[in-house]
Amino acid sequence: MKRTLNLLYLVFAICASNDLLAQVLNTTEISLIPHHTQHDVPNALRGVNQTANSNINWTDNTAFIDEFTAINPGTMRFPGGTFANSYDWELELNNSNNLNLKEAIALADSVDAEINYVINYGTTTPEEAADLVHLLNDPDPIYAAQRQLLFDVSDPIGVKHWELGNELAAKWEWHVSWVAGGYNLNIYYQTNVTPLNMPRAMTDNLHYFGGDIWRKGWVPMAGDGMNQINSMLGTIKKATAQDEIDGEMNIDVEFGPILLGVENAIVWAVDAVIDETAIAQDCEDYPEICQQNIYDLIAAPQNLLDPSEYTVQADGTISIHPTTPLFEDQTILVEYKTHHAGAFDIRDAMKIADPTIEIGYCIDFRTHLLDTAPGFNTRLQISPPDFLIEHPYNDSTDLFLNYGYLSEIMHMVDEYIYEKFIPKEAGLDITCAALEIPEIGLALTEWNIRLCGPGDCHQAYNGILGGLYTANFFSQCYQAEADDLLDIRLSNHFAGIATGFNLIHMWHYNTTTQTVSPTAQSEATRMVNEVIGEYMLHSEEMVIENNPMSTLDRQVNYPDDTSAIIQYEAEALKIYTSDDTINNVLNLLILNNDDSLAHNIQFAIPCDRIGGVDADLEILSGDLTELFSTEASTIQNVSDTYSFTAPMLSVSTLKIPYTPSSTSCACMADYNENGSVETVDFLDLLSEYGCTSNCITDLNADGNILVSDILIFLTFFGGLCP
């Protein structure tokens, strides 16, 4: 079909006059092939992260529910990112201040979204994970009664998509999981003690197969909630006044259980109260040696307890009963050896609990394990994932923004899809075919224009740049999935509602005024999902003429560690359509990624529909601040065409009511009128278009040679004739 469209455009261009060519160059013309078909957009592609550390006041209010409902979410990722690796959903049910699992179930139900759950890989067992699947999905009366007791709902929640942990190949996850990752990671001990190198091949193997590990020493802080204390791999506790009275204390280590036997634990009891003010000042003055100094202070020889002074108990906790009495606020560090099941065992237990669920792994096994680790391929055949998890955050947007390369930021989405996602999926398909396992899809469960963290973030990211990028990411993923370019199982924007303006969120909550404010990202998402959120047309069912080309710059890195800035051409407009055949409305979405020019748009109604008198137009635009605006207007029907101007860096939607035509499109495929449609008809028609005079190009005889004529041309050989 795409070849046909290109040929039609070429033939049309040959026959058109110079005046018409000038008109086409100034206006982008869009039409649809008659008798087009709709493609359903999966709910799982319309996802948003709404994390469990959200204050309940942010989400439990009518304004937020209305805003959330307006974007038509398909899934809500819960409980979150890094901290989800050790999230205790049962304990958090007692926390009425935050969005716990009970409140999340109610919130998802109120906006008609499914929950996409991130399992606490860092602390769970296969049995616990399977129990949660049963609790949320099993219709058995036993689980129905438990749901009623815990969540005030008896029907199954129906959680289909499950992630086994979050970013566990990363070095910033060691404080939330029994094992994490990082390239060239060293675990450090006391000064002058040789550090332990933990290569990715080792940590990835532990992640999948499980095994024994010592939680001992410390790892460098790497952000995402790590500090000088939790970056120590052991568990630190302070003795209480009651512990002092009792002369002993019991500690349940964070990533236990401890393997039985005192040889599997090392306990340090600091012999004096630590001056935390002095420690803080030392870290401010000497940050590069701060962690080492703190560990040396705690794990000093005089603080080491004799194995007779503690007992590893049957449940994997430890009882400490030192001969030197405990005192209040005494710092205790327990280092320990523990055993954990890996992703394979957890996945298998969950699949037994509910074979219909889809489970994703968060570490790409092809990098260090496939065809390399003993037994890995065989085990992967037994325990394959349904999808691999990807978090496509950008790392060069500030550079582009500082130099005014704004269109380039928008086209990062193209680069992700065509240069990363499609090749990655093609590689996965090859692996799956070789192993004879079902195809593995992709899950893009966190993404945004920029992840700013707690630091300053350019205000433009909260304005139209963030909105337009969000619109590009959602819509391009929808279209890639519809056109069978990608198998996307999940796509979740990061994130939902939060306070402050440094992180990039859909909505901001003002704690002073207790109000909810939309952002350009939430408005863009609403507009996209109103038009193509549930169904859309395939790319080949649109006829697009004169999509303006932008000359863009990109940095290319070469194998010899050199780089260069090169130029390339890209279409300025992203164009998507849907046909609401229930309400008889044609929908058009235009993303103008051009950072310097507005562009004129003309949309022609297919010949099998009669357009309404006017159509509804909405435009989201803004400048390089956090300020943005939406403007609504109506566009008049002129000969079944609708025209408007899309401002630079804008999101536009056009909703056109129509009446199905009582007469079908003209059928002239039997061009030579010999009673049959044959190749000769096509050749005769091409000859007609290629002549130098008397060309029949105005096929609908309306006095103009427009896209509608090409549509009739298309019905001759590409469309259906009744």
Language model segments and positions:
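Active-site groove signature of glycoside hydrolases
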Residues: 143-199, 205-212, 391-394, 438-450
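Aromatic/acidic polysaccharide-binding cleft in carbohydrate-active enzymes
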Residues: 443-573
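Catalytic domains of carbohydrate-active enzymes, especially glycoside hydrolases
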Residues: 60-84, 103-107, 111
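Cellulosome-associated attachment modules in secreted, modular CAZymes
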Residues: 661-722
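C-terminal beta-strand-rich structural cap/linker in extracellular carbohydrate-active enzymes
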Residues: 634-662
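Noncatalytic carbohydrate-binding groove/subsite architecture in carbohydrate-active enzymes
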Residues: 135-136, 199, 204-218, 222-235, ...
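Extended beta-strand solenoid/passenger and fiber regions
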Residues: 187, 191-338
